[in-house]
């Protein structure tokens, strides 16, 4: 096997080990990785973690499944029906799995343990900064989507509890959507977001898994045994245009994006080997595919092209089984928002400390003031935007393009740089194939990012 000469000296990339940029981000709630030491064995050696292969599959599935599930029936409608939606997901799955394997390979080569650290080490300073900015933006947008989801589910629950018709007009002020979102956010989300450390991640992980599987089960059951008042609208059989198919890309990328948290999972395994990891992510993505397809197909066929961007909004408020699903989603989002905010705040903190040239070991008072200020600004901005953005589809259409960067662009760049760093005088055909595949990933990811972002700006946000 060719020797890989990826530079592991942080100074050569213009980094400083005391500037905070090495913060661990988006680590899975179930992953526990000991800090690296100077003489530690690289991943794949005897210094592996404690996670079994089966445990790694569960963690990756958990990282993959989330709030994007609610938008999949609408994505099938956008793509042009069941056949187009299935074809698009199956085609994307190949690239999604390969991106996860590439990240594991580059993690071994660079001896780094988180997504952004791998990008920093393999691709250099500029790409590393872009990656961190993308992570911060992505987590910010996801927090907005979480608040919108809370408002969506609360509207339906309050309509039943207050025994009043849904929609504007005639409702008491305390049932107003903006008031209920703000009250919930200030009472629950803000206090959970301020602490320096997050110790409840395992509970959020459990709630997310239970809520996701329950929502999927309810949607499938409601399709098989529909209520009398639920009649589907037009069922599309083909896409209106090829552009319509690509408009479903953001939801798929947002739904399957687990790449940022995959690197810590890989390094937490007892035997962190690329071959074993390939089996782990293949099994995990097949499970996630089954969940997303079940939700997307049954939700779309139940409501047709009239399905809401949040599929649970399409069901009657009085349906108790769906009401339980809404409660699960709210609880899951309430605990997931602080985790995503923590990840985004860690990136911003690292960028700020690096820019200022400040050491991590500063006095506690300054760190606390800066943390509270960062949290308040983040919280208020996401809340303000969530109050005026009507549905999660518009948010996902924007951050889905960033998810494509995590799935395609950064892994592609890492693969190219890793292969270019191999010290071989004669490049075999496999070397050229890998470089070409990396170029394909970058090109495809850049196209998806550009097309979906432009569409989101000119069609969704400016409409």
UniProtKB/Swiss-Prot annotation:
InterPro entries: AA_transpt_TM (IPR013057). It comes from the Eukaryota. The chain crosses the membrane at residues 56-76, 82-102, 130-150, 179-199, 206-226, 240-260, 283-303, 320-340, 372-392, 396-416, 429-449. It holds the Pfam family Aa_trans. The modification Phosphoserine is found at residue 28. GO terms for molecular function: L-asparagine transmembrane transporter activity; L-asparagine:sodium symporter activity; L-glutamine transmembrane transporter activity; L-glutamine:sodium symporter activity. It is found in: Lysosome membrane; Cell projection, Axon. Keywords: Amino-acid transport, Cell projection, Ion transport, Lysosome, Membrane, Phosphoprotein, Sodium, Sodium transport, Transmembrane, Transmembrane helix, Transport. It catalyses: L-asparagine(in) + Na(+)(in) = L-asparagine(out) + Na(+)(out); L-glutamine(in) + Na(+)(in) = L-glutamine(out) + Na(+)(out). Belongs to the amino acid/polyamine transporter 2 family. This is Sodium-coupled neutral amino acid transporter 7. It comes from Bos taurus. The gene is SLC38A7.
């Amino acid at each position: 096997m060719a020797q890989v000469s990826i530079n592991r000296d942080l100074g050569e990339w213009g980094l400083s080990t005391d500037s905070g940029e090495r913060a661990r981000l988006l680590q899975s709630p179930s992953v526990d990785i000991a800090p690296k030491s100077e003489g530690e064995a690289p991943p794949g050696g005897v210094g592996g973690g404690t996670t079994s292969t089966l445990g790694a599959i569960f963690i990756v599935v958990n990282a993959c499944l989330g709030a994007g599930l609610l938008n999949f029936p609408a994505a099938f409608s956008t793509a042009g029906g069941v056949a187009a939606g299935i074809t698009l997901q199956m085609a994307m799955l190949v690239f999604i799995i390969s991106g996860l394997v590439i990240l594991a390979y580059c993690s071994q080569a660079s001896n780094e343990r988180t997504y952004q650290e791998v990008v920093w080490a393999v691709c250099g300073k500029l790409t590393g900064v872009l990656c961190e900015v993308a992570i911060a933006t992505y987590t910010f947008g996801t927090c907005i989507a979480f608040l919108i989801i809370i408002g969506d589910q609360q509207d339906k629950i309050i309509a039943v509890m207050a025994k009043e018709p849904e929609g504007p007009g005639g409702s008491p002020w305390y049932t107003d959507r903006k008031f209920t979102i703000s009250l919930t956010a200030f009472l629950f989300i803000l206090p959970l977001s301020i602490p320096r450390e997050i110790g409840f991640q395992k509970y959020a992980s459990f709630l997310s898994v239970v809520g996701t599987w329950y929502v999927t089960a309810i949607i499938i059951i409601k399709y098989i045994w529909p209520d009398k008042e639920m009649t589907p609208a037009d069922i599309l059989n083909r896409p209106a245009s090829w552009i319509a198919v690509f408009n479903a890309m953001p939801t798929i990328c947002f739904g399957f994006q687990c790449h940022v948290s995959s690197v810590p999972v890989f390094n937490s395994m007892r035997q962190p080997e690329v071959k074993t990891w390939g089996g782990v992510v293949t099994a995990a993505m097949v499970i996630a595919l089954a969940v997303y397809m079940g939700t997307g197909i049954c939700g779309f066929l139940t409501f047709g092209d009239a399905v809401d961007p949040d599929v649970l909004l399409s069901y009657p408020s009085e349906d108790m089984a769906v009401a339980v699903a809404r409660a699960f989603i709210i609880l899951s989002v309430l605990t997931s928002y602080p985790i995503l905010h923590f990840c985004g705040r860690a990136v911003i903190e690292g960028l700020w400390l690096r820019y200022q040239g400040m050491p991590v070991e500063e006095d506690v008072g300054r760190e606390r003031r800066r943390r509270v200020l960062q949290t308040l600004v983040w919280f208020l901005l996401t809340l303000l935007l969530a109050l005026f953005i009507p549905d999660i589809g518009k948010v996902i259409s924007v951050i889905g393009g960033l998810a494509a960067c995590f799935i395609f662009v950064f892994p592609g760049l890492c693969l190219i740089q890793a292969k270019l760093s191999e010290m071989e005088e004669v490049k075999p055909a496999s070397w050229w194939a890998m470089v070409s595949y990396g170029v394909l990933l970058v090109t495809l990811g850049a196209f998806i990012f550009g097309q979906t972002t432009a569409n989101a700006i000119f069609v969704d946000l400016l409409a």
